[in-house]
């Protein structure tokens, strides 16, 4: 293995490239960079495990890409695709066929919200939850490192089990977050690949030399029985996924499980979640457990098929309160999907804990340690609110939890936090991407970069969030405590609270064309007061005159 700095999309694309012979693509935000990366590698002659460049097929829509995925798999080629949101919805008819015919295709999905009352390009789990009934295996990653590792596991297990996989991770929050990770090399995974299963897959392919009949119409006399005959494949699937998790664990030294437990062994309150929120919850648990709490987290990796036995084994027997967090909304349902699975796991069992559920993070709404605290405060009430929302103020139906008090920075103590305010297309985001990759590649620092911006291609507000630390960074939320803040557009001084959250010894850099005299007049009083508060006590005029005018 080698260390490399990349985002979640690149990690998933690299994992898929090893095992893919044909890639059927159609671009859609935020999954497009995966197809772009595969296209670039194939064009430069990069080889997969079979010693050939990937054959890329770009179709007219996601429906065409799904049809190509289906047909290519029927023809005996290991095929992948990359999509999200409405694109995944267009693939549903083919997913039923692919799963029903036991074809080992893999879809890598940067999970994104669906267009309902409005369209949003940002991340949640609405699209993935819309395909859970198709029979496709759903495997969740919560970080850039997991995108690499579980991306490989999805392909390894798909071929071995003859089952199609959707490997999904949070759009933007994970797909576009840059981290330094361990990259699995070809020699690391070649020996793990089930080459016999590949040969059997090719033998079952449609071939005029040994014709078979598929895709028939069946009548009531046999359809039910044949549909039920697929059950053994799903019953054995969890063990297959864990088998390859164990093999990846041996190579990497990590500990992947179908349901990973993190926290106090005798926890009385346990969170259940999947995706990038798990990193936030882990960081919050570390902070709170050192202060006397007994908290834990069960991170769901294998969501479908949901293995109740493996899930219950992961939850400590000491748990008295369970909080299930879903990053989706299913209007009219008795509860959100993960919540219902967890409730069902304890149905009819004696001594079941109190189980409540809620929603968070729709359309990439930031999920912070303060939100974890709000959820914790709620579950400890005498009558906790069920079906709650967190991170927003719901003044219509009153489902939102009251905001918790802000807690100190839960990131590593040595973590340096930097924010850059920029203007879409001014180069701030691109420069920061280059800088963080250089620092990650040429120093021993762990790095994290996330870029907050709206749907406009250019001309909008951008805020770059960069973190640097000697230890791995799990802070999958926007920076609230900054050591360094730079503003690259002087107009922002009147439009935004630029210095909100700056540390006492923080640095503020303003890129502007004003002279020292103009600076004293142009800067808003609030910004000046903040600068005075965090500098040595001196006359205001003197402070103004010392402030830099450009960068």
Regions found by a protein language model. Give the residues of each.
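Anionic-ligand anchoring segments at beta-strand to alpha-helix junctions in alpha/beta enzyme folds, i.e.
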Residues: 22-58, 272-298, 417-481, 485
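Conserved small/polar residues in nucleotide/adenosyl-binding loops
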Residues: 534-543
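Phosphate/diphosphate-binding loops
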Residues: 326-348, 352-388, 478-492, 498
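Thiamine diphosphate
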Residues: 1-130, 135, 152, 369, ...
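ADP-ribose/adenylate-binding Rossmann-like module
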Residues: 501-523
């Amino acid at each position: 293995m080698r260390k490399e700095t990349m985002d979640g999309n690149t990690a998933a694309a690299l994992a898929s490239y090893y095992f893919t012979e044909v890639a059927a693509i159609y671009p859609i935000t935020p999954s497009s960079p995966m197809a772009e990366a595969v296209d670039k590698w194939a064009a430069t002659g990069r080889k997969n495990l079979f010693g050939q460049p990937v054959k890329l097929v770009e179709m007219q829509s996601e429906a065409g890409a799904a049809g190509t995925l289906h047909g290519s798999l029927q023809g005996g080629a290991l095929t992948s695709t990359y999509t999200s949101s409405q694109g995944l919805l267009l693939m549903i008819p083919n997913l039923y066929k692919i799963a029903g015919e036991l074809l080992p295709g893999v879809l890598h999905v940067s999970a994104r919200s669906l267009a309902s009352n409005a369209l949003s390009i940002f991340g949640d789990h609405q699209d993935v939850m819309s395909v859970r009934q198709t029979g496709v295996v759903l495997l969740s990653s919560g970080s850039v490192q997991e995108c690499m590792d579980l991306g490989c596991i999805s392909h390894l297990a798909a071929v071995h089990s003859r089952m199609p996989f959707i490997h999904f991770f949070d759009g933007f929050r994970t797909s576009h977050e840059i981290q330094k990770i361990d990259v699995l090399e070809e020699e690391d995974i070649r020996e793990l690949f089930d080459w016999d299963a590949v040969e059997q897959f090719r033998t079952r392919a449609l071939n005029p030399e040994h014709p078979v009949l598929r895709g028939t119409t069946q009548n009531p006399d046999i359809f039910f029985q044949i549909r039920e005959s697929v059950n053994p494949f799903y019953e054995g699937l969890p063990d297959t996924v864990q088998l390859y998790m164990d093999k990846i664990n041996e190579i990497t030294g990590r500990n992947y499980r179908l349901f990973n437990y993190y926290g106090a062994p005798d926890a009385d309150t346990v969170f259940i979640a999947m995706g990038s929120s798990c990193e936030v919850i882990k960081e919050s648990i570390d902070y709170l457990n050192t202060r006397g709490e007994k908290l834990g987290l069960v991170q769901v990796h294998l969501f479908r098929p949901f293995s109740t036995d493996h899930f219950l084994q992961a939850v400590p027997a000491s748990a008295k309160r369970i909080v299930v967090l879903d990053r989706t909304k299913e209007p009219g349902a008795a509860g959100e999907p993960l919540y219902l699975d967890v409730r069902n796991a304890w149905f009819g069992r004696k001594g079941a804990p109190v189980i409540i559920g809620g929603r968070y993070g729709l359309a990439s709404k930031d999920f912070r340690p303060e939100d974890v605290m709000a959820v914790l405060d709620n579950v400890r009430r005498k009558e906790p609110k069920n079906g709650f929302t967190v991170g927003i103020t719901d003044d219509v139906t009153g489902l939102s939890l009251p905001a918790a008090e802000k807690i100190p920075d839960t990131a590593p103590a040595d973590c340096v936090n930097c924010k850059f305010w920029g203007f879409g297309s001014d180069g701030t985001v691109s420069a920061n991407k280059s800088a963080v990759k250089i620092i990650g590649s040429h120093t021993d620092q762990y790095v994290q970069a996330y870029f907050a911006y709206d749907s406009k291609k250019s001309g909008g507000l951008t805020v770059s969030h960069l973190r640097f630390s000697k230890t791995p960074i799990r802070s999958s939320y926007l920076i609230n405590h900054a050591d360094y803040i730079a503003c690259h557009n002087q107009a922002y001084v009147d439009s935004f609270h630029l210095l909100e959250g700056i540390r006492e010894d923080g640095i503020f850099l303003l890129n502007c064309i004003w002279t020292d005299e103009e600076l004293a007049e142009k800067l808003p009083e609030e910004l000046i007061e903040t600068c005075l508060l965090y500098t040595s006590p001196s006359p205001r005029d003197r402070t103004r005159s010392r402030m830099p005018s450009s960068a």
